[in-house]
Amino acid sequence: EDRTY
């Protein structure tokens, strides 16, 4: 899972 904020 990749998350970019």
UniProtKB/Swiss-Prot annotation:
GO terms for cellular component: extracellular region. The keyword Secreted applies. Keywords: Cell wall, Secreted. It is found in: Secreted, Cell wall. It comes from the Eukaryota. This is 65 kDa cell wall protein. It comes from Arabidopsis thaliana.
